[in-house]
Regions:
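Secretory targeting and sorting signals
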Residues: 1-32
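Positively charged, low-complexity intrinsically disordered regions
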Residues: 10, 84, 127-130, 195-196
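N-terminal low-complexity, Pro/Thr/Ser-rich intrinsically disordered segments
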Residues: 73-98
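Active-site nucleophile-adjacent alpha helix/oxyanion-hole segment immediately C-terminal to the catalytic cysteine
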Residues: 91-141
Length: 284
């Protein structure tokens, strides 16, 4: 399902249009939870997501599985090192991503691509049109999975493929999340944002906000599919809070009616953000 702000189910850019645009989704939906986590209480909004998500299982390629395992091992080491250095790194540590406001109501994906890319190479002002073309973004948004873009060896994950194409050697890999992320999912995300930030990379997060569930800062209590760039973490709390850049920030209310309440940059609990991304995931 594509995921771009703002796309509430009841408006012209409907979830039905989104569902028609791609045909696959998260493997985490059907996977067994880690031992001891089978009884994790349903996250707020999880039942809604389960009821309305018609996407099937997604697949990581063998190369992506190997890369994810290798990065996970490195991330665990990075997180442990960061905890040891916490006193010296008081406050938020950022990767330095450069914000852009999305140019249309459905270009949060292209904006997130150029923002996330800028965290590593420091280049501002890249074309969102070029990013939209690369991602195969349409009026339904930018897909989480199920779209092969025009790069060598596409995997079906357009954001991951675009980032790896534009940042050779970056090793971006998608991490899918279940509707109710487990304690392990939340701990892994803390390790991943620590690892990426410490290595000068941001994370592209694919949010699925639903009525009754948690929302990003300034977002209304409606269903919204959205991409954001997660560019740092709180060293004082071992990444219990993170910093993210929201492409809706700075957008005219004539384009997105509720944009006026959305900051360009915001802090949020990492557990809350992990829950918001449940049913989709992030590219780290």
């Amino acid at each position: 399902m594509p995921s771009s702000a703002f796309l509430p189910r009841a408006l012209a850019l409907t979830a039905a249009a989104l569902l028609a645009a791609t045909a696959a989704a998260s493997p985490a939906h059907a996977s067994a939870p880690p031992p001891g986590e089978a009884d994790t209480p349903l996250a707020p909004g999880a039942a809604y997501k389960a009821a309305y998500d018609t996407l099937g299982a997604q697949r990581l390629t063998p190369a992506q599985r190997r890369l994810d395992a290798a990065k996970q091992a490195r991330a665990a080491d990075t997180s442990a090192t960061a905890r040891g250095a916490g006193a010296a790194l008081a406050g938020y540590k950022l990767s330095g991503a450069l914000h852009q406001s999305q140019k249309t109501s459905y270009w949060c994906g292209p904006a997130t691509l150029v923002i996330t890319q800028s965290a590593h190479d420091g280049v501002a002002g890249r074309s969102q049109q070029d990013a939209a073309t690369l991602l195969k973004t349409n009026t339904s948004g930018t897909a989480w999975y199920g779209v092969d873009i025009n790069v060598p060896g596409p995997t079906g994950y357009p954001m991951a493929d675009a980032l790896n194409h534009r940042l050779p050697g970056a090793g971006y890999v998608p991490r899918a999340l279940p509707y109710t992320p487990t304690a392990t999912d939340k701990a892994n995300f803390k390790q991943h944002i620590t690892h990426n930030t410490d290595h000068d990379y941001a994370i592209a997060g694919n949010a699925w906000e639903v009525p009754g569930g948690p929302h990003l800062v300034g977002h209304p209590n409606i269903e919204i599919f959205h991409w954001v760039s997660i560019d740092g973490y709180n060293t004082d709390t071992a990444a219990a809070q993170v910093d993210y850049l929201d492409p809706v920030g700075g957008v005219s209310t004539s384009v997105i009616s509720w944009a006026g309440s959305v900051p360009k940059s915001a802090h949020i609990s990492s557990d809350t953000l992990t829950t918001i991304m449940g049913g989709r995931g992030y590219v780290w």
